[in-house]
């Protein structure tokens, strides 16, 4: 019985440590989200027309990445300390879209990135079917 209670104590304390780390990470991400909001405002209102559209689109996608990571952490606490797979897939899709927007020089690379998005969308569809859905 002593081993079982010790294991539970270790698991509970590691869970607390993980929770504190995720709360600190969420706070850092909120700071970056605010900084990105300020950056988007500067790009929107203070930049010249030629470069501002690309910078604005890239900034918006980065903004969504921060937003999705924060939403993932919130969902972790709401779902009883569980990371839903579909949020990681959303983050992956958004990150690849950002990569396509930023680096679209090589058409073969862009095609490979697009294929990766297709694989992630199919994975998202499969993860949301009734057999695999946990939520």
Curated annotation (Swiss-Prot):
**Membrane topology note:** Multi-pass membrane protein
Q: Domain of life of the organism in this record?
A: Bacteria
UniProtKB keywords? Cell inner membrane, Cell membrane, Membrane, Transmembrane, Transmembrane helix
Keyword hit for Cell inner membrane: yes
- TM spans (from-to): 20-40, 54-74, 82-102, 107-127
UniProt record similarity statement: Belongs to the PsiE family.
Q: What is this protein called?
A: Protein PsiE homolog
